[in-house]
């Protein structure tokens, strides 16, 4: 059986929209992916406080980039988490992110306060597909699981070489 969702939007709380594009470098000797630029366009209705909205968007993008490239929860057979500290559970630092640029598309949402829509969760969704597509453009390899690690990229490149 599959879990299906019929409708995930509310007529009284329209969703925000976002598009993202990633520019990366892939080291073909090691498989390491380095983010260079990430550009996001966000429609969250009327932006009430641009500085706070930008910080919210940038923070969510960093979380999404971390989920895409670094964060890998590992468990023992008994269900205990193996990587329980920041030495073994990797999260990105500001130095890992490259340049992030966020632009807002202003629209007016009648049901929102002062025409605003939410911005909280939408920004974490675009880094994974944007980076996966950038890796595909750079290597011809398609990844559908996260994180996309240097080891996976290198193994894919070696397999591709042998074929």
Q: In which residue ranges do the predicted regions lie?
A:
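C-terminal catalytic domains of large/alpha subunits in multi-subunit enzymes
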Residues: 2, 6-163
């Amino acid at each position: 059986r599959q879990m299906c969702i019929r409708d995930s939007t509310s007529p009284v709380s329209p969703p925000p929209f976002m598009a993202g594009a990633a520019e990366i470098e892939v080291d073909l000797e090691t498989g390491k992916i380095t983010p260079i630029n990430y550009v996001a366009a966000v429609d969250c209705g009327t932006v009430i406080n641009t500085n706070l909205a930008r910080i919210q968007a940038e923070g969510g993008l960093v979380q999404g980039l971390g989920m895409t490239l670094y964060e890998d929860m590992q468990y023992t057979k008994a269900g205990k988490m193996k990587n329980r500290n920041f030495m073994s559970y990797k999260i990105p630092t500001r130095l890992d992110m490259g340049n992030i640029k966020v632009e807002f598309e202003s629209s007016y949402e009648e049901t929102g306060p002062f025409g605003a829509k939410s911005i909280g969760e939408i920004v974490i969704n675009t880094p994974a597909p944007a980076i996966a597509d950038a890796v595909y453009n750079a290597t011809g390899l398609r990844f559908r699981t996260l994180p996309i690690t240097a080891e996976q990229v290198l193994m894919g490149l070696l397999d591709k070489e042998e074929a």
